[in-house]
């Protein structure tokens, strides 16, 4: 059934690529793991474990396997259920290997779960800039063009005013967490900390 579903939503003409994709999905579900050694245990093959892992690696490194192109038709169909709805999207990130790599993901919030819309991998530590996430945000905006309103949520790691400016450009509302000592420049030129403005927590 997974194969049939993928064939109905994805234009990939090479059936072998679709079949390999299906078995990777099955491996993810049955193993409850993203580790290739665990996924490979659920791939039917006469090869030993190392051979099955190599098979998955070859599929992942195939130049014709572009993850966004494979994922986009699936998420586009899923998002039809949110047409004309008000939605919330969450940007979060994590790092691995002593911050050698940072992963950023923009997800649709739904029933205390996060449905991935777009993602980005960045080398090295440090705060991410909105310029580096431009493609990620634009991809999500394209996917969400049928919804009524979008509210962007992020923590204090994305507090730069450029993020707010980008949200306004996309016609998104936004709620970006900031530290209570963050300075705000008023119309008269004064710079005051947020905690001196009488703003209640959560507002």
Kindly give the residue locations of the regions a language model identified:
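Short, contiguous clusters of charged residues that form electrostatic/catalytic patches at enzyme active sites
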Residues: 37, 73, 88-89, 131, ...
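Short, conserved catalytic/metal-binding motifs centered on acidic residues
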Residues: 39, 88-95, 106, 114, ...
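Extended interaction regions within the primary functional domain
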Residues: 5-8, 18, 109-112, 123-127
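An internal, acidic/charged active-site-proximal segment
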Residues: 121-203
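Electropositive nucleic-acid engagement tracts
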Residues: 2-85
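Structured nucleic-acid-interacting core domains from mobile-element enzymes and related host factors
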Residues: 65-115
